Regions:
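Metal- or metallocofactor-binding catalytic centers and their adjacent structured scaffolds
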Residues: 232-265, 271
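Intrinsically disordered, low-complexity regulatory segments
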Residues: 1-162, 166, 337, 465
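C-terminal or mid-to-C-terminal helical accessory/interaction module adjacent to the motor/catalytic core
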Residues: 71, 93, 135-219, 254-258
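Amphipathic alpha-helical transducer elements in NTP-driven molecular machines
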Residues: 9-16, 33-36, 40, 76-87, ...
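Conserved short loop/turn motifs at secondary-structure junctions
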Residues: 1, 101-104, 181-183, 254-263, ...
Length: 698
């Protein structure tokens, strides 16, 4: 009997249904000589430093670096029952083979292997490797199970990734947190990503905009533009020379251009476009795609390929025709799909591009949640576009002379809309404008053609700063980090993997190093300060991209895991030995920002709120309002920020409900600041005057 272990319950249910294991028991499905059970994500994790030695539970510089060998592992809190269920199933006498059906990728391999090792299982392992949750794909994959040993290199790559993250994260986080007296989360991939955000923010801050001018020449049905003028007087002088002058068309060039269909989606391009069109975060897009995968509507989402394999040509053709029947695509012109343009066996490693499945003909798309529906239609649109004809147009450039100055007008004439028709119809359904082009149609200008009485206007413009990163542009930057320093034949470049980049962004936001402002991702002051104090090995996108490339080489059997880990350990040791102390100014970088609540009545410096007082920022001044001053505690009133603010601003404040010990009752009065310049501040009470009645009584 085979025991199949999936990564999550929903996947196990689909596998069990497809393979005929229809009987549900406690923690597994059974039937057809199969048992199907599940993990719940990472059941087994590396032990925290404190687990190796009680001494490590407290963060101290003298304990660093912490370099465990061998690494130890523990069960994730709250998942003990799930693990014990799997161990019991593995140990059943009638189970002779274990099938690893966790996600077909690096992390899925790690999740299964760590459970298998901790359970002490030694039974043979086979690997289910599929890219779709369709019943047919599951059955086909099950008929072609591979020996688990074929994926040993992938497992070693996953282990190296996990150990490297632990070593860098634990040691660097403890080191800089101890030095700066604040928890500073440092990560092997998240910190270089933060560095890119900080660098872009600095460029925006330091950008100096420059003014320039353009001359705009109005012609029959078109507008031609001059070169830039940096001197406004020169621009006005040129405009004066052109106004009313004759205009001559000096050249007209026409060039037929062809824009090939876009490639299919991998996860990163799907996340980027979903951010542009709908504002979805990378994590939201991954969650929607994962849900659609588990509903059998999309293929495996965590892929870095944008092509299909040759054996998928027939299936792809069928899916294309099904997608073309869905609104809004059913309004497109008839076209014959060019499936061969999407096929490239050499560009598919673990998983092919993301496409819809044959299940779409069985599902009511309108019944899907909005986010999933939008994403699903995006993938359908991309499949149709990728298999359509090229977009063909004629690019027209006309140049003109007026008053001795040259002007240029650009336009285009569409010859065949091709794939852009599908894209245009989809965007129209979203009320989105089509992608920008290079101008509209130009009149039929001819060389030597002349125009009388030129109309010229001077327009003012400014150079623009770099734009803040959005999730779209940050994902692109992460994907391409280190690209120029890694050989072209390398399979993976960049920071992280398609499957991990969303989580990296979320960690930076959760740690308070990055904040979302609309679609923009902006580093916080703490984030910028962190990048400032960290050494280059921890902030360099290029170095981290090279590490990611090494992990890929390990997964392919082309690099030694031990050499990789030795390099990580050496780097950690060097960082710890280099950073043993910091300057006094450095200690202030992560001090919490204090709110100014008023001005000191003695010296005029700002007054800040502290834990126990409201004190002048100039310590030599000595002005302090103590929160536990007996004046307030005896009257059972709290010296609040509002009361302190009023006292500093007006010298007095009205306070209600003060307690009188003598009368055993509350009363209202004005409290007046009575500062005599001594060590302690005095206060006076002023009671409202009672009104005198007409008979003289109060």
């Amino acid at each position: 009997m085979k025991l199949i272990i999936a990564e999550k319950p929903s996947v196990a249910k689909s596998i069990a249904s497809a393979l005929g294991a229809s009987s549900r028991a406690d923690g597994f499905y059974e039937g057809n000589d199969l048992l199907v059970s599940w993990c719940v994500g990472h059941l087994v994790s590396p032990m925290d430093a404190g687990g190796y030695d009680e001494h490590f539970k407290k963060w101290r510089y003298d304990d660093l670096p912490i370099l465990p060998e061998p690494f130890r592992y523990v069960l994730a809190p709250g998942k003990e029952d799930t693990f014990e269920n799997l161990r019991a199933l593995m140990n059943r006498p009638d189970v002779d083979t274990i099938v690893n059906a966790c996600d077909a990728g690096r992390e899925g391999e790690l999740i299964f292997r760590l459970v298998y090792e901790m359970a002490g299982c030694r039974k043979p392992v086979l690997r289910l490797w599929i890219s779709s949750m369709e019943d047919s794909a599951i059955r086909e994959g099950f008929s072609d199970l591979r020996p688990g040993a074929d994926y040993e290199a992938l497992y070693q790559s996953a282990l190296c990734r996990q150990k490297a993250d632990w070593l860098v994260g634990i040691n660097a986080t403890r080191l800089f947190s101890v030095l700066y007296h604040r928890t500073l989360n440092v990560g092997r991939v998240q910190t270089p990503t933060l560095a890119m955000l900080a660098e872009r923010d600095a460029k925006i801050t330091l950008f100096h905009k420059e003014k320039y001018h353009l001359l705009r020449l109005t012609l029959d049905g078109a507008e031609a533009v001059s070169e830039k003028f940096t001197d406004p007087a020169e621009a006005e002088q040129a405009a004066a020379m052109c106004k009313g002058a004759a205009v001559t068309c000096t050249s007209v060039t026409r060039e037929q251009k062809k824009e090939q269909p876009p490639k299919l989606y991998d996860l990163t391009t799907l996340q980027r476009e979903a951010n542009r069109l709908f504002g979805y975060t990378a994590k939201q897009t991954l969650d929607y795609a994962q849900s659609l995968y588990e509903k059998k509507l999309l293929t495996y989402p965590r892929t870095d390929s944008r092509y299909l394999t040759s054996d998928m040509a027939e299936t792809a053709s069928c899916v294309i025709h099904l997608a073309a029947k869905l609104p809004p695509f059913d309004g497109c012109s008839n076209f014959f799909p060019l499936v061969e343009t999407m096929i490239s066996d050499k560009d598919v490693s673990d998983h092919h591009a993301i496409i819809p499945t044959m299940e779409i003909e069985k599902v009511d798309i309108k019944a899907l949640p909005l986010g999933e529906r939008n994403l699903f239609l995006m993938v359908c649109c991309k499949l149709l576009c990728a298999s359509a004809e090229p977009y063909v147009y004629e690019a027209v450039t006309a140049t003109f002379d007026c008053g001795g100055h040259s002007f240029t007008a650009k336009g285009k004439c569409i010859l065949s809309e091709g794939w852009r028709e599908i894209d245009r119809i989809f965007r129209a359904s979203l009320k989105e404008k089509p992608a920008d082009g290079d101008g509209g149609t130009l009149p039929d200008f001819t060389e030597g053609q002349t125009f009388d009485g030129a109309e010229v206007a001077v327009t003012e413009h400014f150079t623009q700063p770099p734009k803040p990163y959005t999730e779209d542009t940050l994902l692109s930057a992460m994907e391409n980090a280190g690209k120029d320093n890694i050989p072209d034949e390398a399979e993976r470049k960049g920071l992280g993997t398609p499957a991990t980049r969303a989580a990296i962004i979320e960690k930076l936001v959760a740690a308070g190093f990055v904040e979302r402002k609309g679609k923009n991702l902006i580093p916080t002051k703490a984030g910028i300060n962190l990048v400032t104090v960290l050494p280059e090995p921890l902030t360099s996108p290029m170095l981290t991209a090279e590490w990611e490339q090494k992990l890929t080489e390990i997964a392919k059997g082309g690099a030694d895991p031990d050499i990789f880990m030795d390099g990580i350990r050496t780097m950690v040791q060097e960082i710890v030995s280099t950073y043993s102390c910091i300057s006094e100014d450095g200690k202030k970088l992560f001090a919490p920002e204090k709110e100014v609540i008023g001005t000191c009545p003695r010296c005029g410096q700002p007054v800040y709120e502290g834990k126990k007082n409201f004190a002048c920022s100039d310590r030599s001044c000595g002005f302090v309002l103590w929160k536990n001053d007996r004046f307030w505690t005896s009257r059972r009133k709290e010296l609040t920020k509002k009361i302190a603010t009023d006292l500093l601003k007006k010298g007095r404040t009205n306070v209600k409900g003060m307690w009188s010990e003598k009368k055993q009752a509350t009363y209202d009065a004005a409290v007046i600041l009575d500062d005599t310049g001594g060590k302690y501040i005095n206060f006076k009470l002023e009671f409202p005057k009672r009104k005198v009645s007409s008979d003289g009584r109060k």
